Amino acid sequence: MGKNWKWLAKLFAFFGVCVGLFGIGTFSQVNGIASAINGFFDPDNAHCVKILPFLGEYSWSVVIASLILTVCVAAVLIGGVKRIASVSQIVVPFMAILYFAFAIILIICNITEIPAAIKVIVTAAFTPKAVTGGSMFVAMQKGVARGIFSNEAGLGSAPIAAAAAQTKEPVRQGLVSMTGTFIDTIVICTLTGLSIVLTGAWQVEGLEGVEVTTYAFQQGLPFPPAVSSFVLMLCLVFFAFTTILGWDYYSERCLEYLSGGNLKHVKVYRWIYIFAVFIGPYMTVSAVWTIADIFNGLMALPNMIALFALSGVVVRETKAFFKKQS
């Protein structure tokens, strides 16, 4: 695109730092972890404590979760304790398989309800009320927002990691990166969505975020509710923890670009990032999602401009790659 477009790269990098610090990287992840842990250990919020005068009361499980998470993240980012990150990366694939297995079991146990569930999904999306009332556009907006949160498609974050790969074929690396979007959205999100609709969890009032999935697993699986809740909590903790570390890497690279390679800024940023991890559990779910959606959109905008501008290059390189393979 040329040097005249450097401003777009800087804009992308700036919003990349914001997404890492306020969006996908910290607030939403630690808030989800704290919510899952609280749902398992203290679902009724029977044991609350007040940690600061200007804050409300929070369950002891939320407070302990925020402290442990902060210490673990600080140990990796500041203390260089890479073993924690290494263990998480080893365990996460097994957690993904376990989550997949539980979702499949739930669907099999409720297989007779699948036609009704699909009917609910389709009719809710295309009823005259949904179309004329504008709720269809709201659903589309929510779908795009949650899709970005799930697979980061169009966000521009995946190329930051892909750029570190040792490969002579950028197209091959792009194809590898695409599999993440397919697995996240087409497989995992479809299984989760079906689980929620099959068990009626989406209709239960007062449930937010991970609480909806927890309720679905508790109601739909042939295991004691405590077992289902514990497994889901464990999966979420490892998924979210590795995401926190991953987004620190993404946002650090963005900051490094903005600062011209000055690592002093990166060291300061790590402490700010750790503080964001600490305060995330004390935010409301609605605030967390709103902030994440805003910064996701802002980061995606310059990336989408670049994608459209470079689409010709992508097509040319892709054709050349497949021609070479044949």
What residue ranges belong to the model's regions?
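C-terminal membrane-solvent junction of multi-pass transporters and transport-like membrane proteins
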Residues: G2-W7, M233-F278, S311-S326
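Extracellular/periplasmic helix-exit of transmembrane alpha-helices
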Residues: F102-V120, P128-G134, A164-T167, T179, ...
